Swiss-Prot record:
EC number assigned by the record: 2.8.1.8
Cofactor binding, note field: Binds 2 [4Fe-4S] clusters per subunit. One cluster is coordinated with 3 cysteines and an exchangeable S-adenosyl-L-methionine.
Binding site for [4Fe-4S] cluster 1: C68, C73, C79, S307
Protein name per the record: Lipoyl synthase
Name of the top EC class for this enzyme: transferase
Pfam families documented for this protein: LIAS_N, Radical_SAM
Gene Ontology MF, one: 4 iron, 4 sulfur cluster binding
Organism: Methylorubrum populi (strain ATCC BAA-705 / NCIMB 13946 / BJ001)
Encoding gene, per UniProt annotation: lipA
Pathway annotation: Protein modification; protein lipoylation via endogenous pathway; protein N(6)-(lipoyl)lysine from octanoyl-[acyl-carrier-protein]: step 2/2
Length: 334
């Protein structure tokens, strides 16, 4: 063994770099699908302003991950120009393999114990009045990352007491007690996306369970009715209108306050194809239907994303609840 190591150490042959690990190894076997040309109503301005660069520098300096970059969000230029960024905690590698998502998949690294403080520091430096924190799925962790969420919320509260906190969580499937840990940290908004209608889960979101996600949102309200709840879906995946309307009913039965609906955009040829681009007038019709069903707030446009305009939407949420329901209810320990 020593001889082999000596030979390797003295080897002067040119080093051959190992091939980069594919971003989505589980999708390698999938046939390529054509990426359709986007219609005019989905075009966005390319990022590159001074404020955008400043936001990027703060994110890099704190060695943070943002879902804006990892998911290829089309609104990154607009949001970062306003110094808004959605922080993605617990690494850049997800343990799920959803057919729509551009986030890297595989076996994640260990948690960074300093990450909550790094996020809090970036929030303070950016001067955020409202921050959105999301994460990859961490099925490898006993609590799914619930304690890490809790610590991040607490760190932000310490560093920026006036900042409201919105979280976008995974489903904590088969992680008993995890949700209770996160809710106890008292985020101002608890967001968990259904992503699509139940009939599409097998092909679009195979690692999740639709009614588990609905129940998760319902349980948040049972644990603390003062927390706003929010969920979002993508359209253009082949769903029917009646399926979307039924999904609205399911969310209202769980007392969800805020619904977002946006156009699905295909990240690569290996991802789920865009079945169609839904025109703006159909988004408007979805918005009208959702408001009629009792949602406090609805955002339904082709470029709507969960965190887009989150700060402004939080102010609108508070105003809508006050106008419709009166002062916020008092939390009851469950």
């Amino acid at each position: 063994m020593a001889v082999v190591l000596d030979l390797l150490n003295n080897d002067t042959r040119p080093k051959v770099e190992a091939p980069a690990r594919p971003r989505h190894p589980e999708k390698a076997h999938r046939p390529d699908t054509a990426i359709q040309r986007k219609p005019d109503w989905i075009r966005v301005k390319a990022p590159g302003s001074k404020l955008w660069a400043e936001t990027k520098d703060i994110v890099r300096a704190n060695n943070l991950v943002t879902v804006c970059e990892e998911a290829g969000c089309p609104n990154i230029g607009e949001c970062w120009e306003k110094r808004h960024a959605t922080f993605m905690i617990m690494g850049d590698t997800c343990t799920r393999a959803c057919a729509f998502c551009n986030v890297r998949t595989g076996l994640p690294e260990s948690l960074d114990a300093a990450e909550p403080e790094k996020v809090a520091d970036a929030v303070a430096k950016l001067g955020l009045h409202h921050v959105v924190v999301t994460s990859v799925d961490r099925d490898d962790l006993k609590d799914g990352g619930a304690e890490h969420f809790s610590r991040t919320i607490a760190a932000i509260r310490r560093a920026s007491p006036g900042t409201t906190v919105e979280i976008l969580t995974p489903d904590f499937l088969r992680k008993p007690g995890a949700l209770e840990v996160v809710v106890a940290a008292k985020p101002d908004v608890f967001n968990h996306n259904l992503e699509t209608v139940p009939g599409k889960y097998v092909t679009v979101r195979p690692g999740a369970r639709y009614f588990h996600s609905v129940r998760l949102l319902q349980r948040v309200k049972e644990l603390d009715p003062t927390i706003f709840t929010k969920s979002g879906i993508m359209v253009g995946l082949g769903e029917e209108r009646n399926e979307v309307v039924q999904l609205m009913d399911d969310l209202r039965s769980a007392e969800v306050d805020f619904l977002t609906i946006g156009q699905y955009l295909q990240p690569t040829r290996k991802h789920h194809e865009v079945v169609r681009f839904v025109p703006p007038d159909e988004f408007k019709a979805y918005e009208t239907t959702a408001y009629a069903k009792g949602f406090l707030l609805v955002s339904a446009t082709p470029l709507t994303r969960s965190s887009h305009h989150a700060g402004e939407d939080f102010a609108r949420l508070k105003a809508a609840r006050l106008a419709k329901l009166g002062p916020a209810p008092v939390a009851v320990n469950a």
